[in-house]
């Protein structure tokens, strides 16, 4: 599998980041977590993954110190400047068509879909070109209602069933993208 994963890490809860980290490491995928601050859980996972990969290389007979040093995790933490949409802009500029992107941010999802990326939210639901306009419209209506003091229904807290749903849908998406890539 050679496609990339891009994570809007500001909008993805820690429990879901762990699911993404484990899958990316297991499959050897390039995975970038983008946020306006460093996320300790991601940084630690990258260090642990790099250590495990270097141990594996040593076990396979690689002994040259420079060759060992070159072995690194394909997961990275990208810290962008604080500011409105700075992480979003970085993801849009960096993601290639057919990348898998994970975000809860509907305008970002729309921009990524226009670029030809696959996008899922923090519940594992896939954003599509067919439904993104409706989601953007709902977002505008909810924003207007909030400005009037009327609070629209919000998603509930992330719980174990939400995490399982995300994990299942994320795995299905990885399988689907892997098959698409193999077919090309």
Predicted features and spans:
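Nuclease catalytic cores that cleave nucleic-acid phosphodiester bonds
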Residues: 1-184
